[in-house]
């Protein structure tokens, strides 16, 4: 069908409950199909297992194994102020922050990967050709008050500037930290 690399599986919560044997067969097929993965950490851990007795399922797909297999993992956030997740805020740094906790991705490289999963990897999954800061790109970016990807997730920094097509559309004063 010519769909390699152009198909994404969203949520994939059932993979959390699969035994290792079944999962090992399925992930091989996903890699062969060059499938993209879009877990939705905030909603997945809120709804999945909600009505279970103990032990309760966490409900987020097997992100570490999917990344290790070479699949593109781009975190999503599809429920905002609705009956399924009334706490949604459209804040993708919040999504990545939750994902690294739920998926046990707290190593240095894993945390950087979580940041990428809401930035560059997401753009790759969406086939956004003009993403980035190279000549010819749209010039869409957010400037954060932090020094690196890990601080972006750890500190929940002030968004100093939001820039769209090279124009500042929002700005904020820096936060003074004690």
What are these regions (language model features)?
Residues 5-6, 47, 57-144:
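His/Asp/Glu-enriched, well-ordered alpha-helical/loop segment
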Residues 11-13, 39-42, 75-79, 137, ...:
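Active-site proximal loops enriched in glycine and acidic residues that flank catalytic Cys/His/Asp
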Residues 17-18, 47, 109, 152, ...:
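Glycine/Thr-rich phosphate-binding loops of Rossmann-like dinucleotide-binding domains
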Residues 20-24, 86-89, 156:
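Conserved strand-to-helix beginnings and helix N-cap segments that scaffold or border functional pockets
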Residues 25-26, 54, 90-92, 159-160:
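Short, solvent-exposed amphipathic alpha-helical segments in soluble enzyme
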Residues 124, 135-178:
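C-terminal cap of metal-dependent C-N hydrolases
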